Regions:
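Glycine-rich segments within core transmembrane alpha-helices of 12-TM secondary carriers
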Residues: 161-185, 387-398
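C-terminal transmembrane helical hairpin of 12-TM major facilitator-type secondary transporters
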Residues: 318-365
């Protein structure tokens, strides 16, 4: 059963109980940490962890084991969405957001402090895997809560704009994570970086967590949740209610996120791998050159996120997403071979800039659209669950599927794969209702 839409009264009074700036900063900082952590772990999992946390007999096996710990977070995220969603819908948004940020932050700092295999043996990879699971658990509850914090405190007609602030965490986290590693590579020797320098970004994230906690603790509870709590309308088991009474909208919400996840991981992880791999497997471009291209292209991503929020508030959340998803399909069908496949650095950069700008346009409205699909009593659980299940279907496998398709069928097949995933998103969008005028 899908939640019914309630039309907003154009004359509805809006009395904010939380400072606008606090709401926006509190919703942004958690997702910024989320993506910062993702990129520093992804980088370290390839270049550092195989040498620090795993036996040195077989370098290939050590790298694969390291990447397996990276994948653990994708398994943990839906579990985190169920756990934190339960308390977010039962106890409140504020307390749950503080708990998810603490879980994520402590796990990240622990990774930066862990001794290696040479010191504690087999306990090193086990503790790394446990800390990575803790990261994923916290991440599973972070995005949904941040999106609700923004949208449930937003004034009428500005929900997509407010909801775009958690989405800004993706380009900000990406930019600072890669910038941190570039800075460390300039300041330290390879020996210094492998000895202790890699730990700096993980430990530094504690500063961001402390700032986020300070802002979140000072907030009042979401006014939308307070109404439900006062009326004692919380459900006993939000996940059970979601999967029995709101199955259709949960499935649609998951498929709506597919194009976003697939596009992001193809534009970042796969494009980096393909561009830097030696010919004939890849383009053979220098790693630092491609990293700089990605960092510059991510600026386009960041600019387009709030632009997409403004457009969605003006023309409709669902309608704008239908148009943007159609543009992603066209990009997927016509941009891969002429731009990325050219090997020309200028055209490769144009490909990255165009793709990541589209990423900003599709990711921006999600902070409002997904929460709007669910009623208040299961909104935290529903938005988080759809978002994180989609990460398994779209994010975790996209780079591997893309690499396999390119090896066996050519670069055009990667574009067809992205177009197919965006097509599923387009169908899901067409099966949902417009949510812009819906009351939360």
């Amino acid at each position: 059963m899908q939640a019914t839409a309630t039309t907003l009264d154009h004359e509805q009074e809006y009395t904010p109980i939380n400072s606008r700036n606090k709401v926006l900063v509190a919703s942004l900082i958690g997702t910024a940490i989320e993506f910062f952590d993702f990129y520093i772990y992804a980088t370290a999992a390839v270049i550092v962890f195989p040498h620090i946390f795993f036996p040195q007999g077989d370098p290939t096996a050590a790298t694969l084991q390291s990447l397996a710990t990276f994948a653990i977070a994708f398994v943990a995220r839906p579990i985190g969405s169920a756990v934190f969603g339960h308390f977010g819908d039962r106890v409140g948004r504020k307390a749950t957001l503080v708990a998810s940020l603490l879980t994520m932050g402590i796990s990240t700092v622990v990774i930066g402090l862990l001794p290696g295999y040479a010191t504690i043996g087999i306990f090193a990879p086990l503790l790394l895997a446990l800390a990575r699971f803790g990261q994923g658990l916290g991440l599973g509850g972070e995005w949904g809560g941040a999106a609700l914090l923004a949208t449930e405190n937003a004034p009428p007609r500005k929900r997509a704009l407010y909801g775009s602030f958690p989405q800004l965490g993706a380009p900000i986290g990406f930019f600072f994570a890669n910038g941190t590693f570039l800075l460390l590579s300039w300041l330290l020797t390879d020996e210094q970086f492998m000895s202790w320098g890699w730990r700096v970004p993980f430990i530094f994230s504690a500063v961001l967590v402390i700032i986020g906690l300070y802002v979140r603790v000072s907030l009042h509870e979401s006014p939308v949740f307070e109404k439900v709590a006062k009326a004692k309308k919380q459900v006993k088991i939000p996940l059970g209610t979601l999967l029995t009474k709101h199955v259709r909208v949960t499935v649609l919400g998951t498929f709506i996120m597919l194009a976003t996840y697939t596009l992001f991981y193809i534009m970042t992880v796969y494009s980096m791998t393909f561009s830097t791999a030696a010919a004939p497997v890849g383009l053979g471009l220098p790693r630092n050159e491609v990293l700089w291209m990605l960092m510059m292209a991510v600026i386009g991503f960041g600019v387009m996120v709030p632009v997409a929020g403004l457009l969605a508030d003006a023309f409709g959340h669902r309608k704008s997403m239908v148009i943007i998803t159609t543009l992603i399909i066209l990009f997927a069908l016509f941009a891969f071979n002429p731009l990325l496949g050219s090997g020309n650095p200028i055209l490769v950069f144009a490909f990255l800039l165009l793709g990541l700008s589209l990423m900003g346009l599709t990711f921006g409205p999600m902070g409002a659209l997904l929460p709007e699909l669910f009623p208040t009593e299961v909104r935290y659980t529903g938005a988080s669950f759809s978002y994180n299940v989609a990460s398994i279907l779209g994010a975790s496998v996209a780079p591997y599927i893309a690499a396999w398709l390119q090896t066996n069928y050519g670069l055009g097949a990667v574009g067809l794969y992205l177009a197919a995933m965006a097509g599923l998103t387009l169908i899901a969008l067409l099966l949902t209702h417009e949510t812009r005028h819906q009351s939360l």
